[in-house]
Amino acid sequence: MITHPQFDPVLISIGPLAVRWYALSYILGFILFTFLGRRRIAQGLSVFTKESLDDFLTWGILGVILGGRLGYVLFYKFSDYLAHPLDIFKVWEGGMSFHGGFLGVVIAIWLFGRKHGIGFLKLMDTVAPLVPLGLASGRIGNFINGELWGRVTDINAFWAMGFPQARYEDLEAAAHNPLWAEWLQQYGMLPRHPSQLYQFALEGICLFAVVWLFSKKQRPTGQVASLFLGGYGIFRFIAEFARQPDDYLGLLTLGLSMGQWLSVPMIVLGIVGFVRFGMKKQH
């Protein structure tokens, strides 16, 4: 079993100011978005100009941050924030939801498209291939922080990793499983899936490869966005089987996690949209 390397979450600290790895992962994601966006403009595969891409980035950042935070509040810890509403603004303490961020970006795309006279689906198709590497960057940020670890796996698995931050979850799991209790006593930690890296590979690298390559030629309007939607939903649904369920929610109906249930409509809409738009002529 490998022990998580325990990175310092603060990259640089100057007086009261601190630059955190997790914040840097978001910044890197936005840089990658801009870089890939400019490549697509040069290839003639974008509805953006260089100027409008930079303008949209501001809208997108607001959508990610506001949507991600509100999504986390509503989907995961609503009762806690209802009791302490001012904690909603403590974004430095963590707590972001991809599904909320996704909805925030969709709203930003709709508003931006209305302002600039760009069709919603055409804009979605343009944005979709630029997103997955940013998701990959965010998962690396999760790994560096030692958060969102995976479920318990076999002690002899070469990929097994112990997370010191999971002490409470380790104790709780060991209390219900004699073998795990033995492992915990012997090794001090339980072997877990490094699910952040699985999500990095699936939702980040694999999704990027699929959507980027598919969108290298003109496709029917809406099909690229549908591929991203369904692809993310499928990859996230799979990765959630290795990820530790949120301690304040656990597993829900049918033994699925909140992340899986939120991914189901993405999968359905993505598949239906991909087939439906694919039956139309390119325009």
Swiss-Prot record:
It is a multi-pass membrane protein. The chain crosses the membrane at residues 17-37, 56-76, 92-112, 117-137, 194-214, 222-242, 255-275. Pfam families: LGT (PF01790). Its EC number is 2.5.1.145. It is found in: Cell inner membrane. It is an enzyme of class 2 (transferase). Pathway: Protein modification; lipoprotein biosynthesis (diacylglyceryl transfer). The gene is lgt. The keyword Chloroplast does not apply. Belongs to the Lgt family. This is Phosphatidylglycerol--prolipoprotein diacylglyceryl transferase. Keywords: Cell inner membrane, Cell membrane, Membrane, Transferase, Transmembrane, Transmembrane helix. InterPro entries: Lgt. A 1,2-diacyl-sn-glycero-3-phospho-(1'-sn-glycerol) binds at residue 139. GO terms for cellular component: plasma membrane. Disulfide bonds: none annotated. GO terms for molecular function: phosphatidylglycerol-prolipoprotein diacylglyceryl transferase activity. Catalyzes the transfer of the diacylglyceryl group from phosphatidylglycerol to the sulfhydryl group of the N-terminal cysteine of a prolipoprotein, the first step in the formation of mature lipoproteins.
